[in-house]
């Protein structure tokens, strides 16, 4: 499981991205890169990391489910993910 501080940092970044999204789009459209560079660094969407909602793992995530591969497999085998079945052919 990821450290609590790493998860909290990512949540803080999500809030900043949401707060400055409109202003950032406006500045991009106007081509005002000087003002854009004055915005907080963490308000850029590229600094966000998709993390597992259960464990906070930052790698091997399925966006559709919001889970890392380990938790996805565990929950799928337990039958807790509706519509997901193990493939067999």
UniProtKB/Swiss-Prot annotation:
Keywords: Ribonucleoprotein, Ribosomal protein, RNA-binding, rRNA-binding
Residue pairs linked by disulfide bridges in the UniProt entry: none
Gene3D superfamilies named in the record: 30s Ribosomal Protein S14, Chain N
Domain of life: Bacteria
SUPFAM superfamilies according to UniProt: Glucocorticoid receptor-like (DNA-binding domain) (SSF57716)
Protein family: Belongs to the universal ribosomal protein uS14 family.
UniProt cross-references to NCBIfam families, sorted A to Z: PRK08881.1
Subunit structure: Part of the 30S ribosomal subunit. Contacts proteins S3 and S10.
Entries under PANTHER family matching the protein: 30S RIBOSOMAL PROTEIN S14, SMALL RIBOSOMAL SUBUNIT PROTEIN US14M
Protein name as it appears in the record: Small ribosomal subunit protein uS14
Biological source species: Chlorobaculum tepidum (strain ATCC 49652 / DSM 12025 / NBRC 103806 / TLS)
């Amino acid at each position: 499981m990821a450290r609590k501080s790493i998860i909290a940092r990512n949540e803080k970044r999500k809030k900043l991205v949401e707060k400055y999204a409109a202003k950032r789009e406006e500045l991009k459209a106007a081509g005002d890169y000087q003002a854009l560079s004055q915005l907080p660094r963490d308000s850029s969407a590229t600094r966000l990391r998709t993390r597992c909602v259960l464990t906070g793992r930052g790698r091997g995530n399925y966006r559709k489910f919001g889970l890392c591969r380990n938790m996805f497999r565990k929950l799928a085998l337990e039958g807790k993910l509706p519509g997901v079945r193990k493939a067999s052919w």
